[in-house]
């Protein structure tokens, strides 16, 4: 990875099992190996019924998001956050990529065409960690985490990429970055 590359770590929390139900998003922007910006927002999902399972995970309820902007409004208002970045990073990237794609589709917006780096795969490949849940990787690296708060999860993910690149600057090559 070129040291001057910029990326955004992203994390979603969802209201139910459907991928278009984002109710919170955290984004952490990194440029030249330093965190330069953070964004956290609550999002009003398309349905008011929250899965008890999801509420138990992240603690967000309809009453917390009923006055929040829907995804389309939030994403358009904050579109500039992704300007100049070369990739997105997420822990279990297939989940966050699918949430972003489903929310963009539902909102009639194009999904970003940036490659995703998965920090689960980084942790397995670089440090041979098992298990690779976010708290496990953070504990291994000595990182603070308020798990299932999208802002904290996104920052932890950004710091995992930073640690991986510091240890092996070529570790992102398998992701096409």
Question: Residue locations for each model-derived region?
Answer:
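Acidic two-metal-ion nuclease catalytic site recognized across multiple nuclease folds
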Residues: 1, 158-177
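Conserved non-catalytic scaffold segment of RNase H-like nuclease domains
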Residues: 1-113, 128, 135-148
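Buried hydrophobic packing segments
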Residues: 100, 122, 157-161
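P-loop/Walker A phosphate-binding loop and immediately adjacent motor/lid segment at beta-alpha junctions
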Residues: 113-114, 170
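Beta-strand segments within the central parallel beta-sheet cores of soluble alpha/beta enzyme folds
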Residues: 114-118, 175-177
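Short alpha-helix plus adjacent loop in nuclease-associated cores
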Residues: 116-133
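Conserved catalytic/binding loops enriched for acidic/polar residues
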Residues: 153
């Amino acid at each position: 990875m070129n040291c001057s590359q910029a990326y955004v770590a992203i994390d979603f929390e969802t209201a139910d099992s459907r991928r278009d139900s984002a109710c919170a998003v955290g984004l952490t922007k990194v440029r030249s190996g330093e965190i330069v910006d953070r964004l956290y927002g609550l999002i009003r999902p398309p349905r008011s019924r929250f899965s008890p399972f999801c509420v138990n995970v992240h603690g967000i309820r309809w009453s917390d998001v009923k006055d929040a902007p829907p995804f389309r409004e939030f994403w358009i208002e904050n579109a500039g956050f992704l300007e100049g970045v070369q990739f997105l990073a997420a822990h279990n990237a297939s989940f966050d990529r699918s949430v972003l794609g489903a929310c963009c589709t539902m909102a009639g917006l194009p999904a970003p065409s940036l490659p995703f780096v998965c920090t689960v795969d980084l942790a397995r490949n670089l440090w041979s960690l098992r298990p690779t849940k976010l708290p496990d990787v953070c504990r291994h690296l000595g990182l603070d985490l308020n798990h299932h708060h999208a802002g904290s999860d996104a920052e932890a993910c950004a710091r995992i990429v930073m640690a991986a690149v510091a240890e092996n600057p070529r570790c992102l090559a398998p992701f096409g970055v």
